[in-house]
UniProtKB/Swiss-Prot annotation:
Annotated GO MF terms: structural constituent of ribosome
InterPro entries registered for this protein in UniProt: Ribosomal_bS16 (IPR000307), Ribosomal_bS16_dom_sf (IPR023803)
Key words, A-Z: Ribonucleoprotein, Ribosomal protein
One GO cellular component term noted in the UniProt record for this chain: cytoplasm
Protein name per the record: Small ribosomal subunit protein bS16
Species in which this protein is naturally found: Francisella philomiragia subsp. philomiragia (strain ATCC 25017 / CCUG 19701 / FSC 153 / O#319-036)
GO biological process: translation
Amino acid sequence: MVVIRMARGGAKKRPFYRIVVADKRSPRDGRFIEKLGFFNPLAKGGEERLKLDVAKAEAWLAKGAQPSDRVASLIKEAKKVA
């Protein structure tokens, strides 16, 4: 099954997430099919908190990809902004 989930990056205590499409069996931070954007939970000032290609996300959802709970809420948030 194909899922849309977050892959963690960044330093210790400073998380930064890439929003990726991956096979469910792949490791969290491992192999992925396509990168859709990023999420920075610790963004301050002028830094961008969320960048997501909504069109690509919609295309993957139409193909049957299942978003994680957090990614589903981020997609909804990105649609409001766009």
